[in-house]
Amino acid sequence: MNIGQASKASGVSTKMIRYYDEIGLVRPASRTGSNYREYDDRQVNELRFIKRARGLGFAVAEIQHLLSLWRDRARPSREVKAIAERHLADLDARIAEMQAMADTLRRLSDCCAGDDRPDCPILEDLTGKRETV
């Protein structure tokens, strides 16, 4: 199948498929005489794998490692689990950071009258003149 058909079958844009080819993540099964990329079911499954992994927030390097493990039928599942648990710990840390930011912004917003007066604790905090609430 051509790149457009592979895109439709996998749900991955043609632009991203070309990018994944460039970085060596997924190679076309073959090339036509006119040098067009051709894909088969294996690459479509790999593209779906990548799309799902990206949707879970894995970085390209992690996806490359996961793909190599997926392709290796003799892989130890503990290695896959370790990658997933590291990623989960990173996600938990980012969520905690974002929650702290949201809590701070919520407190600052609660302190702002939001009326016609010019004084605003949000702007004061952003300039560093006000200690974070």
Model-derived features with residue positions:
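Glycine-centered, phosphate/nucleic-acid-interacting loop/turn motifs that mediate DNA/RNA or nucleotide
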Residues: 24
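Arg/Lys-rich, alpha-helical DNA-contact motif
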Residues: 2-8, 27-33, 41-133
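Append "Primarily bacterial transcriptional regulators
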Residues: 6-7, 17-20, 39
